[in-house]
Amino acid sequence: MPLAGPAAYAIAVYAEPDGTEGGSPYLLRPAQDRSFEGVACVDDAARAVVLYCLLWQRYGISTAWTAAQGLLRFLAYMQDEDGRFTNFILDWKGRKNLTGSTSYLGGPQWQARALHALAWGSSTFGGAEWHERFTRGLPWVCGVMPYLDVRAVCVLAALHHWQATGDASSAKRAITWAEDIAAARSGDILLNATSVQPIHLWGHLQETALAKTGRVLGRPEFVEIALASAEALLIPAADWCSTAPCVLPFEVSCIVSGLATVARSTEDPRYADAAARARAWFLGRNSAGSPVYDHGSGLVYDGIDQGRVSRNSGAESNIEGALALLCSTPQDSPVE
């Protein structure tokens, strides 16, 4: 990516089996679900920063340090002077997509994920740059946010920034945003958006956000709300994913994250056990009866479709699968 600079890394959005004799095992392909979007994006790079920072902090893997630094450089390139991020690059030269429906300056999903990644950059590498970029990008998520699943990412970003820097305003912001999430429920279930049903699990991190905020900042009522939603939504979902004909890795990752974080915040083994059941979806506890994580190749496939494993293998699936599988260790949910 010459336009992004020699140190920047990005991750191809999608890959699919070649299928031709003598061809490479996988071919990269762009995102074009809503017309042509691009070849790599901030959404995936930001998730991967969290993953690689975690691997470096927890295990000291040197290649993870290098990857996190390179992906942070890509995020820096994708941030405008006013603090907003655009999502996609159109090609491997690094030309930005500034006009797509899934790629424009300041889109809430990629703005929130980029801030989460910058908070992890601050905690992992220190220095002024990632803190400055976080501060510059923050105002763009401080307005009204109808998407409570995105707001959950904002909570995790603010909370991690506070843990990295001690900035009291970030802790205050995490509490305020957590209150917004806690106020939007249908019965005990935390909503993705006010009055929007049914609940989709893709990106559903509200239990994760509330359980961690409650534990770290001493707000037990947040833990209780997260526990109630986990009981009503996530524990049933841990078994739903074992039989459902169509399931995405990101759905399972969110189930695992919420249950693992509630388990840590309550010390109740029921939630850890449920997280383990959901995590087993990657290993063959699914309607296909076949692993979605291929241990031999290291790939996570793109999920179960009509009871069969899709052999496509995109960035989101691999990153979210890795985060879910890392939840099998005693530490906090990696998404935190």
Regions found by a protein language model. Name each.
Residues M1-R47, L51, Q57-S101, T124, ...:
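Low-complexity, Ser/Thr/Pro/Gly-enriched N-terminal "stalk/linker" regions
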Residues L98-Y104, R308-V309:
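Short, P/G- and charge-enriched loop/turn segments at secondary-structure junctions
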Residues I89-G94, C154-A157, S195-I199, G296-Y301:
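Short alpha-helical linear motifs
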Residues W140-P146, A184, D188, V196:
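Helix-loop junctions that connect tandem helical modules in alpha-solenoid scaffolds
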Residues V49, C53, W65-Q79, A112-L115, ...:
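Hydrophobic core segments within long, regular secondary-structure runs in both alpha-
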